[in-house]
A protein has these predicted regions:
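Conserved N-terminal beta1-alpha1 strand-loop-helix module at the mouth
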Residues: 1-64, 73-75
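Conserved anion-binding
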Residues: 63, 87-89, 94-145
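Glycine/small-residue-rich loop that forms an oxyanion/phosphate-binding "nest" at active or ligand-binding sites
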Residues: 62-95
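Active-site-adjacent beta->alpha loops and helix N-cap segments on the catalytic face
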Residues: 34-57, 74-79, 96-114, 124-128
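Glycine-rich beta-to-alpha transition loops that act as phosphate-gripper elements at the mouths
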Residues: 6-12, 68-77, 96-97, 119-126
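Short, ordered loop/turn segments at secondary-structure junctions
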Residues: 30-33, 71-72, 97, 143-145
Length: 145
């Protein structure tokens, strides 16, 4: 087993430095829905990244994968995922999922156009994980973040 390093940034300059230092994935964090409420009172960082940041990073990265965390499944997920794919993401991460149906919807929206990663961070997700990992199109599961 090997470690894969990720670095969260929307700065092309910082991303180039990280890539040259061997970081495998440059991470753009678009997750905003419900995040303030979930993390209220915690000493956590909330990124202010955008789809435009993906485009800027795509121009400078040559080795590192471009990983983008989107919002949990919601009424505009299809449009958000479409924009992220079109901007050049290599991997799309789905956070805060709780059901097999949410994961299947995510996979349908991505439609094999890039790699997929599930962020395992809820009790409900853990309870249906055995069924979820049988779905076609999941490339990775990340535990916690």
């Amino acid at each position: 087993m090997s470690l894969n390093f990720m670095y969260i940034t929307n700065s092309p300059t910082v991303a180039e430095i990280a890539e040259n230092a061997g970081v495998e994935s440059i991470f753009v964090d678009l997750e905003k829905l419900g995040k303030e409420e979930r993390q209220r009172g915690l000493d956590s960082v909330k990124s202010n990244h955008s789809v435009q940041d993906i485009i800027g990073l795509r121009k400078v990265l040559t080795k590192s994968k471009l990983l983008v965390r989107v919002d949990p499944i919601h009424e505009r997920s299809e449009q958000q995922i479409e924009a992220v794919v079109n901007a050049g993401a290599d991997i799309i991460m789905l956070p805060m999922w709780k059901t097999v149906e949410e994961v299947q919807q995510f996979l349908d929206y991505v439609n094999h156009r890039c790699k997929t990663m599930l962020l395992l961070e809820t009790k409900e997700a853990d309870q249906c994980l055995d069924e979820v990992v049988r779905l076609s199109g999941i490339d990775a599961v990340h535990i916690g973040l």
